């Protein structure tokens, strides 16, 4: 099956999700972040408490050094998929695949797959999991 070009709405959804993640995880601007997440936000992650309040509450207790970096963002219809890296919260960063369902221009539902970032010694492929360098 040939790849289909993304629609303008898909590009817009990607930009909304990227702005939302930066606003919440990097800038810690909770008031601004509220406009990106639905009040009826559904959370499927095993690591995050339910709802928008659960997510925001978890981030509030994380260290100020928490950072999110994006490597890949793609969209299909109302779904946005990200491959990113969370660091600054402990000794090992997480490499995460996030799937977000958009509804009426806001993040409505979320799933994720999380792995500890492998060091060079741990990588059987010999390649980094995120970017072009292994963690220091």
Regions found by a protein language model. Give the residues of each.
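C-terminal and inter-domain tail/linker signature
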Residues: 1-136
């Amino acid at each position: 099956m040939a790849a289909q070009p993304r629609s303008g709405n898909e590009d817009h959804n990607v930009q909304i999700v990227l702005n939302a993640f930066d606003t919440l995880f990097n800038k810690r601007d909770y008031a601004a972040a509220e406009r990106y997440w639905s009040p009826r936000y559904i959370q499927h992650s095993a690591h995050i408490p339910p709802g928008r309040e659960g997510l925001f509450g978890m981030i509030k207790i994380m260290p100020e050094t928490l950072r999110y970096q994006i490597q890949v963002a793609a969209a299909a219809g109302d779904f946005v998929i990200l491959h990113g890296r969370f660091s600054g919260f402990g000794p090992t960063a997480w490499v995460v695949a996030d799937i977000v369902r958009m509804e009426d221009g806001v993040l409505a539902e979320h799933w994720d797959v999380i792995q500890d970032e492998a060091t060079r010694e741990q990588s059987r492929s010999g390649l980094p999991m995120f970017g072009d360098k292994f963690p220091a």
